[in-house]
């Protein structure tokens, strides 16, 4: 007898709650349809549901996100790097205390080698037709960052191999909830043909019809709740095997209705979050402005805070990291979150004078200053002018429009080509292609769990 099983999946919501009421309505509607046809449907979230750029998530350290997943009655979740490395250790340890669903991650441990109390390496689920589905889960191993937060993250592929060995003789179907990204997921499909489906995330790919790799179906639904994915499995329950598998996505902009209850719940949580973030941090005696393409007060204040916090010789901060001004008078946690919502941590790198000068030259180009940035933790619009503390950078605009750096001093002394300097900056510059010499620096120290807005708060209390 042939039966259909649906696996609905969300990934990388990043606390874009504006789409969540539609997602809830869509999944609830589909559940009703499948129930009428006596067909089973399961629902999964594949991580990065949390993002502290959103003030409700910030105020509750992600617990409202877990509330939303509870209310949707999901069957299981994986964790992403936003759950894993943007929360203080004690907040991640408590994040899923009230979860009504299993959180599946096999490669995360505390420093004593124990899994978090809420984590399981896999789930064996008995389906309505009596077949058994093994649900595995892994997260992307950002080793040095997890280590700084007193967690141990291990190789995901080794854990997938171990988990398959444990479940393969007991499972009719094996699926993987993977927060690794498409390149690693394709490699996992090649390495582990025992997997039937990989529900993937992290790299925000939209696989409208899935992707078949080595007989393994990969499915991903982009980001921000723009889509919900659905994997449809056609199963021969008598032979206990899958005979067909396919993937699709639903564009939420085309879904006409939303859950009124969910919308009301979120509005209530917004009011509560505003109260939680109303604590006064400090008082400004005058307005503090931000200008993205020239030096201004707030980016300069952040640069000074970064230099002092990290104990670096100099610091460098792009002006676009500050999204708006602050008015004179009391400054609250909500104010600081509004102007600096990014889940970005301080970092120091060690650069020779030659490499530092090259980086400063690159930062001064119009191409970099005007660059529109997406990802890397940045939740703003544009890079903007680089602002320094501990360094004086003199530039001039040439006739051809190119900006030239004509003079650099470090704490009053001319920059020395062979001397090694400690530079405080943003962890986003250690990733991607923005500043290769920072990214490739051998000596880096991450300062965690504090975000940049925490440094601003600290500076304002001085």
Q: Which role does the model predict for each range below?
A:
Residues 169, 308, 423:
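Metal-centered catalytic cores of metalloenzymes
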Residues 1-251, 295-300, 305, 446, ...:
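Acidic, metal/ion-coordinating pockets
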